[in-house]
Regions:
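N-terminus-centric sequence/structural signature that marks the extreme N-terminus
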Residues: 1-107
């Protein structure tokens, strides 16, 4: 399983340095990579355990227009069927991950 961490700062901008000890604490859950997102009061971090799309599944994952960002710890078992549905609706995929299926599904809603 991957590991995710995050927080919303109560006042002002999030301190990116505050994510480091959180990610260090869960690093054993995701030895294959680490990524962060910090903007305004929001901070998200991800420790990756590569299972699907070993080369292209880095997180956080951003929408094409950069308006949405997601970190995900889980597995969508029917992601291939959902990929086909979303492709038929005109969505294009940059990765082969179930995380991108989640992101594009949220955009589609």
């Amino acid at each position: 399983m991957c590991g995710i961490a995050g927080f919303i700062a109560g006042h002002g901008a999030a301190n990116a340095a505050a994510l480091a000890p959180m990610l260090a604490r869960i690093a054993h859950r995701g030895p294959d990579g680490q990524g962060t997102f910090v903007e305004g009061p929001a901070a998200l971090g991800h420790c990756r355990l590569a299972i699907i799309d070993l080369a292209g599944g880095a997180q956080p994952l951003y929408s094409e227009d950069k308006n949405l960002v997601v970190v995900f710890n889980g597995e969508i078992y029917n992601y291939r069927a959902l990929t086909a549905e979303l492709t038929a609706l005109g969505h294009t995929f940059a990765t082969r991950t179930d995380t991108e299926v989640l992101l594009l599904s949220l955009i589609h809603i």
